[in-house]
UniProtKB/Swiss-Prot annotation:
One of its GO terms (molecular function) is electron transporter, transferring electrons within the cyclic electron transport pathway of photosynthesis activity. Gene3D superfamilies: plastocyanin oxidoreductase, Single helix bin. InterPro entries: Cyt_b/b6_C, Cyt_b/b6_C_sf, Cyt_b6/f_cplx_suIV, Cytochrome_b_C_euk/bac. It is a multi-pass membrane protein. CDD domains: cytochrome_b_C. It comes from Amphidinium carterae. The chain crosses the membrane at residues 35-55, 94-114, 130-150. This is Cytochrome b6-f complex subunit 4. One of its GO terms (biological process) is photosynthetic electron transport chain. Belongs to the cytochrome b family. PetD subfamily. PANTHER family: CYTOCHROME B (PTHR19271:SF16). It comes from the Eukaryota.
């Protein structure tokens, strides 16, 4: 059922529709069609997909936990690997804490570098892109070194 007929004599509407632009103001309304019929189908599909993945999942993944045995080396979660390795390889604790405090400072300075240039294209902001790529590669290298031994974890050595 069409709710409202379009006014096709207007040149702006015809030119916008010819280019594939414009909004779909005409046709079926969202209430009750989408909300009563499409949303429950999507919600039930998502729930059944999640339950299906839960049913076919392997039960035994890794070793069972033993609360009375301490592992040889305790590793943090994966997103703390670069900072863990940075604290581990620096000889002085004050230098390690200052280096960790410098990470948010570098992030804030990168945001200011991005605001100096008015362009949104990353290829037209080479300084900010270079800072971002360099720090990302160094963080990935630090994260990889955290799972190695201390003699192999030293970057740039």
């Amino acid at each position: 059922m069409v709710v409202r007929l379009p006014y096709v004599k207007g040149s702006i509407l015809c030119s916008a529709l010819a280019k594939g632009c414009g909004h779909n103001y005409y046709g079926e309304p969202a209430w009750p069609n989408d909300i009563l019929y499409i949303f429950p189908v999507v919600i039930l599909g998502t729930i059944s997909f999640s339950l299906g993945l839960g049913v076919i999942e392997n039960q035994a993944i890794g070793e069972p936990a033993n609360p009375f045995a301490t592992p040889l080396e305790i590793l943090p979660e994966w997103y703390f690997f670069p900072t863990f390795n940075l604290l581990r390889i620096l000889p002085d604790k004050l230098v390690g804490v200052l280096s960790l405090a410098s990470v948010p400072v570098i992030l804030v300075l990168t945001a200011f570098i991005e605001n100096i240039n008015r362009y949104q294209n990353p290829f037209r902001r080479p300084v900010a892109s270079l800072v971002y790529l360099t720090s990302t590669c160094y963080a990935l290298w630090l994260g990889y070194g955290s799972v190695l031994g201390i003699s192999e974890a030293l970057p740039f050595v």
